[in-house]
């Protein structure tokens, strides 16, 4: 797994670097390549079982979403749909491993964070208002169920999945905030780092 981890980190770094100073082709190549490497890493997991295919499917949906974000603006709606599907598949994966439990502070915190994000970007969303609201809601549910899984069963795989899901939410928070409200110098780096790290930690949970 060490060499696979190094390959994923190198590819992710080259993808982020392309957003600031690299040629356009570098971003087109290394962003999908990073997810393809994660797909290969997930496929080789020693604890791979039937429900693990949901992780593979989630990565494939994210790969499609990434490809669509590289296209012109009119494809953004489809990209949001692909990311929604990815988070839905991850949510089903988390839910399939737990029984009904409820740790009320977690959904409360997530609701506050979701409301804060919507307050920041609401007036700029225009025709994407409801699709993005739905996507944010799905992301919050994903993090909530990953957290509930860890609180219900505090194991290393559950913690890795919870941290991974949380990083995906942070990535979306930064991406949407910078895209619809105000850009800042490190926005692409933070969003991409959290995005790749989030997917990696969810894949890592298959190894623990």
From Swiss-Prot:
One of its GO terms (cellular component) is plasma membrane. The keyword Cell membrane applies. It is a multi-pass membrane protein. InterPro entries: TMEM86B-like. Belongs to the TMEM86 family. The chain crosses the membrane at residues 35-55, 76-96, 102-122, 132-152, 156-176, 188-208. One of its GO terms (molecular function) is hydrolase activity. The gene is yhhN. The keyword Membrane applies. It is found in: Cell membrane. Keywords: Cell membrane, Membrane, Transmembrane, Transmembrane helix. This is Uncharacterized membrane protein YhhN. Signal peptide: none annotated. PANTHER family: GH04784P. Its main location: membrane.
């Amino acid at each position: 797994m060490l060499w696979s981890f190094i390959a994923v980190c190198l590819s992710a770094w080259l993808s982020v670097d392309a957003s600031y100073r690299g040629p356009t082709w570098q971003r087109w190549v290394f962003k999908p390549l990073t997810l393809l490497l994660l797909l290969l890493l997930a496929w080789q997991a020693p604890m791979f079982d039937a429900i693990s295919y949901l992780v593979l499917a989630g990565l494939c949906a994210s790969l499609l979403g990434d490809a669509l974000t590289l296209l012109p603006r009119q494809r953004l709606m489809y990209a949001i749909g692909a990311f929604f599907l990815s988070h839905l598949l991850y949510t089903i994966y988390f839910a399939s491993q737990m029984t009904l439990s409820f740790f009320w502070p977690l959904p409360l915190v997530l609701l506050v964070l979701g409301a804060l994000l919507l307050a920041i970007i609401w007036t700029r969303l225009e025709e994407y208002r409801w699709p993005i609201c739905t996507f944010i809601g799905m992301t919050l549910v994903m993090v909530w169920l990953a957290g509930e899984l860890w609180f219900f069963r505090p194991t290393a795989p559950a913690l890795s999945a919870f941290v991974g899901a949380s990083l995906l939410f942070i990535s979306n928070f930064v991406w949407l905030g910078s895209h619809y409200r105000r850009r800042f110098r490190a926005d692409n780096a933070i969003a991409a780092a959290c995005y790749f790290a989030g997917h990696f930690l969810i894949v890592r949970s298959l190894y623990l």
